[in-house]
Amino acid sequence: MKALRIVFMGTPEFAVGILDAIAKQNKHEIVGVITAADKPAGRGQKIKYSAVKEYALKKELTLLQPTNLKDESFLLALKSLNANLHIVVAFRMLPKVVWAMPELGTFNLHASLLPNYRGAAPINWAIINGETKTGVTTFFIDDKIDTGAMILSKELEISESENLGDLHDKLMVLGCDAVLETLDKIAHGNVVTTIQEDTSDIKTAYKLDRDNCKIDFTKNITEVYNLIRGLSPYPSAWCNFRDADQEFSIKIYDTKQEVLLHDYTIGSVITTKKEIKIAVLGGFIQVLSLQFPGKKKMMAHELLNGLTFSEFAMVF
């Protein structure tokens, strides 16, 4: 078995789970960690460390935070770590000078069954598009985004009630297994790769923005439901709310479907003392939790304790 000297590259909590699994296995040496530069965040614009940086500091791992991956001083520091393998989990696109540096190459863990859902938000889009299965794939990085030769993939089912947060956590566990198995294959020199086949029906995991996170209530009930759960809890689906002379945007987090014929105007908000429902094509979306401007995320019944909606309330 070849001794692996690993540089790990990642930023969010998803990457921490993988890094921790490698460290706890204690088979290979983590010689360095690369993560995003510190950025101000929140209303106070206080400097916030990435989840991976927090972990690296706690474990006293060598840490690099380049702003430019082609910077000469960074490349010298990276080379001095003398790694023979780089691992990437939820980081950024690497220049060839970085991914081609180690003897054994650089592999990435991607949270989809490639070649489907290449891109920035694979977990979200699998749910938004109503997929019933997804998974993770490890592959060697090349000069394009998520197109390299695949090492292995692992699959799991998506239930109709799971949201982004639920699936994220399941895929992180599955991703740990995939990365450890990939490391074992590389260390023993028995990797067999598969080339990704490009076909016309490949689905893409587009970057999420304000426009594609907006709820379109003219779509059918299942599409509306899937969008909301695919964006919950982050970045969250949103829509405009209007009642009487007030109009503002709200976030919707958790919902249920009620398939039922009705004659309400699409987007009508129907309330009881404990429930909020929205009329959509093919039924009602029951809102379980939501957030109004200037308020924290609340359960629907909590919001209704202090707020009355008129019969003309609408979302759009």
Swiss-Prot record:
UniProt xrefs under Gene3D superfamilies: 3.40.50.12230
Keyword Protein biosynthesis appears in the UniProt entry: yes
InterPro entries (UniProt xref): Fmt, Formyl_trans_C, Formyl_transf_N, Formyl_transf_N_sf, Formyl_transferase-like_C_sf, Met-tRNA-FMT_C, Met-tRNA-FMT_N
Pfam families cross-referenced by the UniProt entry: Formyl_trans_C (PF02911), Formyl_trans_N (PF00551)
GO molecular function: methionyl-tRNA formyltransferase activity
Positions that bind (6S)-5,6,7,8-tetrahydrofolate: S112, L113, L114, P115
EC number(s) per entry: 2.1.2.9
A single Gene Ontology CC term: cytosol
Catalytic activity: L-methionyl-tRNA(fMet) + (6R)-10-formyltetrahydrofolate = N-formyl-L-methionyl-tRNA(fMet) + (6S)-5,6,7,8-tetrahydrofolate + H(+)
Keyword line: Protein biosynthesis, Transferase
Record function comment: Attaches a formyl group to the free amino group of methionyl-tRNA(fMet). The formyl group appears to play a dual role in the initiator identity of N-formylmethionyl-tRNA by promoting its recognition by IF2 and preventing the misappropriation of this tRNA by the elongation apparatus.
HAMAP family documented for this protein: Formyl_trans
UniProt family annotation: Belongs to the Fmt family.
Protein known as: Methionyl-tRNA formyltransferase
Gene: fmt
